[in-house]
């Protein structure tokens, strides 16, 4: 089994992958001040729930992607503890199957690189990926598997939280999918603006990208907040 570690701004995702199949996924909070030992203790909690006396979890290797440089080293040390090997850390220098068509490939977020490489290998080209997380990111891969660039926007929950923090009369709102565009109270208005606004952003940006490409593209959506946006988007999504 391969241990996959995805270090995001809000959560660290852990996954076990065997023969191309995802066996489990778990999450920990991203805490920039945690040490390797503290993260290892958190990982032990995750793995202890999945261990079976007759089938212990054994990792043959690890792959790690990170958008939080402060803790990349700590999680890489954890990966080495569980595998006995140095993890593969995602960067433009590893083989992804993509040609990087941007001036500075090393400035592309590693999470975006993983999204783009997976989509290009598994979906019809050209393909656009949308990752709905702390930030909303679009990545564009053309019909020749060239990474053309993309779009970065504030994430759905980031914008919603900012309203509650920066506007004195607006509350913090629990995220859910709105049932209508017209909100009948403050909370429903905020949900409509945030969730439907993100869906309209997705629809509109995708249309403009397709116009620039000169042809339709496959749209692949991922990320922890996708479940709120997919049901209200007008675009055909994968």
Question: At which residue positions do the language-model features occur?
Answer:
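Glycine-rich phosphate-binding loops at beta-strand->alpha-helix junctions
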Residues: 34, 65-72, 192, 214-233
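A mobile "lid/hinge" subdomain adjacent to the ATP/sugar-phosphate binding pocket shared
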Residues: 164-196, 218, 225-227
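Polyanion-binding loop/helix "lid" in catalytic or ligand-binding cores
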Residues: 187, 193-209, 213, 228
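Conserved small/polar residues in nucleotide/adenosyl-binding loops
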Residues: 235-238
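Short glycine-rich, Thr/Ser-proximal phosphate-binding strand/loop in the N-terminal lobe
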Residues: 2-42, 146-171, 177
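Short glycine-aspartate micro-motif
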Residues: 2-6, 63, 127-131, 220
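Phosphate-binding/catalytic loop of phosphoryl-transfer enzymes
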Residues: 85-89, 94-166, 195-206
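N-terminal phosphate-binding loop and adjacent alpha-helix
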Residues: 22-74, 157, 162, 192, ...
